[in-house]
Curated annotation (Swiss-Prot):
Keyword set includes Thylakoid: no
Entry keyword annotation includes 4Fe-4S: no
Highest taxon, organism lineage: Eukaryota
GO cellular component term of the entry, any: myosin complex
Keywords: Allergen, Calcium, Motor protein, Muscle protein, Myosin, Phosphoprotein, Repeat
UniProt subunit comment: Myosin is a hexamer of 2 heavy chains and 4 light chains.
Other observations noted: This chain binds calcium.
Lineage: Eukaryota, Metazoa, Ecdysozoa, Arthropoda, Crustacea
Organism: Penaeus monodon (Giant tiger prawn)
Protein name: Myosin light chain
Length: 16
């Protein structure tokens, strides 16, 4: 994961 700021499902596709 790349973005662990908000939900792991929200930025899942962005911080893949």
């Amino acid at each position: 994961e790349g973005f662990q700021l908000m939900d792991r499902g929200t930025f899942d596709e962005i911080g893949r």
